[in-house]
């Protein structure tokens, strides 16, 4: 698995409940851009429209060598390839419990197919985010103290 991009902000902003791997319908130039890691997953989300999942907000830059006549929209919606049962299950859960679906990681699998790891998420409150930051700072401080203690 070759990791192309990761949505680190999603791990901070959301509580991840369940993850799933999905295929992407891409153009040839977009695949080439992915191989050069010219992608940004920040602020992406998944919408289910008429029984099909679409990924919105992913920015895939076009290549410099591409012809001026053919420049696709960099932020266009991209269709996700999922099993129907899984899609219906997530659609019901998301609508019933007011959850969202976001993309976490974009990568090439062993067969060199572009895949995205999507997650069913619940938004964190501000105090939850503050608590996470405090825990991270405390853990970092403890590790630094331990390192200093064992060194000298």
Swiss-Prot record:
It is found in: Cytoplasm. Disulfide bonds: none annotated. InterPro entries: SmpB (IPR023620), SsrA-bd_prot (IPR000037), SsrA-bd_prot_CS (IPR020081). SUPFAM superfamilies: Small protein B (SmpB) (SSF74982). Gene3D superfamilies: 2.40.280.10. Its main location: cytoplasm. It comes from the Bacteria. One of its GO terms (cellular component) is cytosol. NCBIfam families: PRK05422.1, smpB. This is SsrA-binding protein. It comes from Helicobacter acinonychis (strain Sheeba).
């Amino acid at each position: 698995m070759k990791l192309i991009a990761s949505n680190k902000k999603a791990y901070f902003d959301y509580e991840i409940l369940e993850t799933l791997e999905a295929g992407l319908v891409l153009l040839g130039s977009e695949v080439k851009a992915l191989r050069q890691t010219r992608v940004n997953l920040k602020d992406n989300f998944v919408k289910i429209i008429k029984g099909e999942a679409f990924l919105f907000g992913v920015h895939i830059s076009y290549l410099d060598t591409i012809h001026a006549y053919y420049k696709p929209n960099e932020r266009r919606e991209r269709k996700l390839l999922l099993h129907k049962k899984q899609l219906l299950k997530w659609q019901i859960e998301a609508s019933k419990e007011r959850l969202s679906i976001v993309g976490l990681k974009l990568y090439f699998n062993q067969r060199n197919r572009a895949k995205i790891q999507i997650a069913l998420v619940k938004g964190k409150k501000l105090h939850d985010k503050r608590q996470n930051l405090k825990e991270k700072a405390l853990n970092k401080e403890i590790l630094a103290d331990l390192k200093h203690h064992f060194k000298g």
